[in-house]
From Swiss-Prot:
Origin organism lineage: Eukaryota, Sar, Stramenopiles, Ochrophyta, Olisthodiscophyceae
Organism: Olisthodiscus luteus
Superkingdom of source: Eukaryota
PANTHER family named in the record: HISTONE 24-RELATED, HISTONE H1
Entry keyword set: Chromosome, DNA-binding, Nucleus
Protein name per UniProt: Histone H1A
Amino acid sequence: PTYYDMVKDAIVALKDRNGSSMQAIKKYIEANQKVEFKQHYLRAALK
């Protein structure tokens, strides 16, 4: 899946009332996806 889709899935799964932090999204993606994590892709997907 694309980073955009992974970020969207993480935000929906985390269900944080005040929004999900970048750290929480990163942790969720690392735990649930089998990809090599790239920080700059996460930042781009969040914009």
